[in-house]
Protein backbone atom coordinates (compact mmCIF):
# COMPACT_ATOMS: atom_id res chain seq x y z
CA UNK A 1 0.00 0.00 0.00
CA UNK A 2 1.09 3.56 -0.67
CA UNK A 3 1.47 6.31 1.89
CA UNK A 4 -1.47 8.52 2.68
CA UNK A 5 -0.53 12.19 2.65
CA UNK A 6 -2.56 14.72 4.59
CA UNK A 7 -1.14 17.73 2.76
CA UNK A 8 -2.06 18.32 -0.90
CA UNK A 9 1.15 20.31 -1.52
CA UNK A 10 4.80 19.73 -0.92
CA UNK A 11 6.07 21.49 2.22
CA UNK A 12 7.61 24.43 0.31
CA UNK A 13 4.41 25.03 -1.65
CA UNK A 14 2.37 24.87 1.55
CA UNK A 15 4.51 27.58 3.12
CA UNK A 16 3.96 29.83 0.12
CA UNK A 17 0.21 29.37 0.45
CA UNK A 18 0.33 30.14 4.18
CA UNK A 19 2.27 33.33 3.49
CA UNK A 20 -0.31 34.43 0.93
CA UNK A 21 -3.09 33.82 3.44
CA UNK A 22 -1.37 35.87 6.13
CA UNK A 23 -0.97 39.00 4.02
CA UNK A 24 -4.70 39.81 3.88
CA UNK A 25 -4.93 39.13 7.61
CA UNK A 26 -2.02 41.51 8.21
CA UNK A 27 -3.67 44.14 6.02
CA UNK A 28 -6.90 43.65 7.95
CA UNK A 29 -5.07 44.07 11.27
CA UNK A 30 -3.39 47.25 10.05
CA UNK A 31 -6.72 48.63 8.86
CA UNK A 32 -8.39 47.82 12.18
CA UNK A 33 -5.48 49.29 14.14
CA UNK A 34 -5.70 52.54 12.20
CA UNK A 35 -9.43 52.66 12.83
CA UNK A 36 -8.93 52.14 16.56
CA UNK A 37 -6.37 54.94 16.70
CA UNK A 38 -8.63 57.28 14.74
CA UNK A 39 -11.55 56.53 17.06
CA UNK A 40 -9.38 57.10 20.14
CA UNK A 41 -8.13 60.42 18.79
CA UNK A 42 -11.65 61.57 17.93
CA UNK A 43 -12.87 60.61 21.38
CA UNK A 44 -10.00 62.48 23.04
CA UNK A 45 -10.68 65.59 20.94
CA UNK A 46 -14.38 65.47 21.81
CA UNK A 47 -13.57 65.10 25.50
CA UNK A 48 -11.12 68.00 25.32
CA UNK A 49 -13.67 70.22 23.59
CA UNK A 50 -16.32 69.36 26.18
CA UNK A 51 -13.95 70.13 29.02
CA UNK A 52 -12.86 73.45 27.55
CA UNK A 53 -16.48 74.44 26.91
CA UNK A 54 -17.35 73.59 30.51
CA UNK A 55 -14.51 75.80 31.77
CA UNK A 56 -15.90 78.75 29.77
CA UNK A 57 -19.24 78.47 31.59
CA UNK A 58 -18.37 79.17 35.25
CA UNK A 59 -21.96 79.90 36.34
CA UNK A 60 -23.09 76.32 35.84
CA UNK A 61 -20.45 74.79 38.12
CA UNK A 62 -19.40 72.18 35.60
CA UNK A 63 -15.73 73.09 35.53
CA UNK A 64 -13.28 70.25 36.00
CA UNK A 65 -11.47 72.10 38.81
CA UNK A 66 -14.67 72.25 40.85
CA UNK A 67 -15.31 68.56 40.21
CA UNK A 68 -11.78 67.68 41.31
CA UNK A 69 -12.27 69.68 44.48
CA UNK A 70 -15.53 67.88 45.22
CA UNK A 71 -13.83 64.52 44.77
CA UNK A 72 -11.16 65.49 47.28
CA UNK A 73 -13.75 66.65 49.79
CA UNK A 74 -12.81 70.31 49.35
CA UNK A 75 -15.01 72.91 47.76
CA UNK A 76 -13.66 74.93 44.86
CA UNK A 77 -13.41 77.96 47.17
CA UNK A 78 -11.06 76.11 49.51
CA UNK A 79 -8.61 75.38 46.69
CA UNK A 80 -7.60 79.03 46.41
CA UNK A 81 -4.90 80.26 48.78
UniProtKB/Swiss-Prot annotation:
InterPro entries on file: AKAP7_isoform_gamma (IPR052641), AKAP7_RI-RII-bd_dom (IPR019511)
Required for membrane localization: annotated segments: 2-11
Cellular component, GO annotation: hippocampal mossy fiber to CA3 synapse; lateral plasma membrane; nucleus
One Gene Ontology term from the biological process aspect of the record: modulation of chemical synaptic transmission
Keywords tagged on the record: Cell membrane, Lipoprotein, Membrane, Myristate, Palmitate
Subcellular location: Lateral cell membrane
Lipid-substituted positions (S-palmitoyl cysteine): 5-6
Bilayer disposition of the protein: Lipid-anchor
UniProt region (RII-binding), positions on chain: 29-42
Lipid linkage positions (N-myristoyl glycine): 2
Annotated stretches, region: Disordered: 49-81
GO molecular function per UniProt: protein kinase A binding; protein kinase binding
Biased composition (Basic and acidic residues): 65-81
Functional summary from the UniProt entry: Targets the cAMP-dependent protein kinase (PKA) to the plasma membrane, and permits functional coupling to the L-type calcium channel. The membrane-associated form reduces epithelial sodium channel (ENaC) activity, whereas the free cytoplasmic form may negatively regulate ENaC channel feedback inhibition by intracellular sodium.
PANTHER family named in the record: A-KINASE ANCHOR PROTEIN 7 ISOFORM GAMMA (PTHR15934:SF6), RNA 2',3'-CYCLIC PHOSPHODIESTERASE (PTHR15934)
Subunit structure: Binds cAMP-dependent protein kinase (PKA). Interacts with PRKCA; only the cytoplasmic form is capable of interacting with PRKCA.
Designated name of the protein: A-kinase anchor protein 7 isoform alpha
Amino acid sequence: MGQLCCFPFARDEGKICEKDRREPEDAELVRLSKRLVENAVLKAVQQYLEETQNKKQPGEGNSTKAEEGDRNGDGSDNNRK
